[in-house]
């Protein structure tokens, strides 16, 4: 399971939970479930021009991405949160597009990590 990349650092993810593969598996499940809902919340808030809601959802994506060491998603969510906090609607739209792209890039390594953790839960 040793894999380090700019997209997903599986070594850091495992170290972040003290080597507890079961807990990491739970965190990965939470991240997968929450991220699609949060991206939908961001999309809806952008349509309404509700930057505080965009910022709140981006913050939650950032925190969950940090918990699983999804580095590029974390960076994209951080940028989106900053744009929303600064009242930059157009910048938030652009940052949201980047976040969606990064989530798409994350899917293969995230699936691989979920499978690796699931195979070696002891």
Tell me what each language-model feature is.
Residues 1-122:
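Two-component system phosphorelay core
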